[in-house]
Structure formats: C-alpha cells, structure tokens
C-alpha cells in the first residue's frame, strides 16, 4: 500500500511540474543551428505579441534562431499562481534554455524586460553572448522623475491647472507602489511619450497588420500583474547601472533607443552610452519606445551588425 501511495505521489508531482512548465507560452522561429536570440518583453502586464507578430520571423530569415515567450502570468502564459518576481522570471528563462537546448543566446530585452534581462545576465553570464537593451528601463526613478518634470513643464506652459494638480498628487504617492508607476506612465502616454512623432508608411502597415492578426487578437493583458509584482518583489524601483558596468566585463553589451522615446532623459541616454560605449550604442531618429516597429529596417540592420 505504501508503494502505491509513493507511485501516486510521484505521478501527481510530475503532473504538477509539467503543468507549471506548460503555462509558459513560447515559440521558436528559424533553424536551431543558427545563433539564438531570445526576446524579453516589457511589463509587468505585457507580452511578446507585438515583437512576435512583426519582427521575429524577419529576424529568423536573416539567419537567427529566434525564441519569443510570455513571462509567467503575463500574456498567453496564464498562471494564477504566478508571483511576478524577478527570480521567478529568471528561473523560467533558464527553463527556456533547457527546452530549446540552448547553451548561449543573444538577448533582446525591451522596456521592463531590460531589467529582467540584466538581472538574468548578472546571474547567468555564461549563458549570454550579448545583451541588447532595447528601449530598456535601467534607472526607474530617474524615468519617473523625468516624466513628471517634463509633463509638469508642458502643463505649466498650457496653464492646465487640473493636470498640474494631478502631477502634484502623483508626486505625493509612495515611490515603490504600483499606483505611482501606473500614474507616471499614464501621464506619459497622455502626452504621447510612447509614440513616434511622424509615423512612416512601413510602421503604419506593420501596426495595421498586427492588429488584424492572431497576435493582435491575443494581446492579453493581466491587469493584476503590476500590483502582484510590487506586492511580491522587493526590487521594484531599481537602478541597474552598477550591474551593467560590471556585466560589460563578461558579456557584450549593446543599447538601442528611439530619439523620441520621451520616458528617458538625455542624461539617462548619455549614461547608457558611457556604459556600453559609443560603438555599441544606437539612437534612431523618428522613433519612440518600440524601435522594432517604429523603424524596423534600421532596427534589424543594427542587430545584424552587432551580432553577426
């Protein structure tokens, strides 16, 4: 009888582990023998559908093995038990390496994914050939301060007292709270900080095709993710510049940002350029927070040049 219980316990444990693994949505593009690229999306609350639907296959056609995935509890990786911590994300990323039998990869880390990619690389430098920060967060409080300072200036010029009061309210919120982060980004969005100034025909077509595609229809957003992240993760408002300075001794570091990505100050961009060095830093004009859509051709050409 004891033996039967042990067998049942083993089966149930195996099923639980497999269920947890299967909650992670991932997909590969291209030939597995080609240099690997893993894309880490933004968030918390995001997904990789925009990159997957517009750029993943095109990069694969250039001779790369491109892997996209949605973090646990975000997008298509539905998991009600997700904690949304960095360590959980790092553990799942390690599992992705095992699933696709990858020893080393080039990581494209976008927005909040820049923090995940940086912390993963810090813990696993032997698994990373290059870390490509793409519109990536790296000094969160500086970003929040910049958003509030510049939008306040805009509203002062417009004499918009209602929004000036709103900014003052945001400034009084706890800096390590989901509400503070959310309201900073909401006011940035209201001021078009995430939009390219002069959309090109190519960029418009990419977005239109994406919206009509299965990827656009699966643009799932977990509105609880930011709250749970701030509840469970102590490192919820960090500056990774010191980490990046150490990392460049171990892995190749690159950074690509939109000239009109207005959530970053000029000081922040200069700081990043100093860390990765000028030859590994790219600013794209008429481009905001999504370089792989706003200026896709230049984005792909830059990636090719860096990791050829």
Predicted features and spans:
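Conserved alpha/beta-hydrolase
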Residues: 60-76
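Conserved hydrolase catalytic core segment
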Residues: 104-146
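Conserved acidic catalytic loop of the alpha/beta-hydrolase fold
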Residues: 88-105
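Glycine-rich "HGGG/HGxG" loop immediately N-terminal to the catalytic nucleophile
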Residues: 49, 71-86, 142
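The serine-hydrolase catalytic nucleophile loop
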Residues: 44-55
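Flexible "cap/lid" loop of the alpha/beta hydrolase fold
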Residues: 133-176
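Short beta-strand/loop motif that positions the catalytic acidic residue
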Residues: 249, 255-257
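Catalytic histidine-centered segment of alpha/beta-hydrolase-like enzymes
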Residues: 287-296
């Amino acid at each position: 009888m004891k033996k039967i219980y042990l067998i049942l316990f083993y089966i149930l444990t195996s099923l639980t582990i497999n269920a947890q693994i299967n909650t992670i949505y991932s997909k590969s593009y291209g030939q597995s023998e080609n240099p690997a690229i893993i894309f880490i999306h933004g968030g918390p609350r995001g997904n990789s559908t925009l990159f997957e639907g517009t750029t993943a296959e095109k990069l694969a056609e250039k001779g790369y093995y491109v892997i996209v995935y949605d973090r646990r509890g975000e997008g298509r990786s539905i998991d009600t038990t997700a904690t949304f911590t960095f360590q959980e994300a790092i553990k799942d990323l390690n599992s992705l390496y095992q699933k696709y039998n990858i020893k080393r990869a080039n990581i494209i880390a976008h927005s909040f994914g820049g923090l995940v990619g940086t912390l993963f690389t810090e813990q696993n430098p032997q698994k990373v050939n290059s870390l490509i920060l793409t519109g990536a967060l790296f000094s969160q409080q500086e970003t929040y301060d910049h958003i509030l300072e510049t939008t306040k200036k805009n509203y002062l010029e417009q004499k918009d007292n209602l929004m000036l009061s709103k900014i003052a309210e945001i400034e009084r919120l706890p800096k390590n709270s989901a509400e503070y982060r959310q309201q900073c980004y909401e006011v940035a969005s209201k001021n078009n900080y995430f939009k390219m100034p002069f959309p090109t025909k190519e960029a418009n077509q990419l977005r239109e095709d994406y919206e009509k595609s299965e990827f656009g229809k699966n643009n799932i957003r977990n509105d609880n993710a930011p709250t749970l992240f701030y509840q469970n993760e102590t490192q919820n408002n960090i500056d990774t510049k010191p980490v990046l300075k150490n990392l460049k001794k171990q892995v190749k570091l690159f950074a690509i940002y939109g000239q009109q990505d207005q959530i970053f100050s000029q000081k922040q961009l200069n700081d990043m350029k100093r860390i990765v060095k000028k030859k590994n830093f790219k600013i794209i004009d008429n481009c905001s927070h999504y370089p792989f859509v706003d200026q896709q051709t230049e984005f792909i050409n830059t990636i090719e040049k860096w990791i050829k």
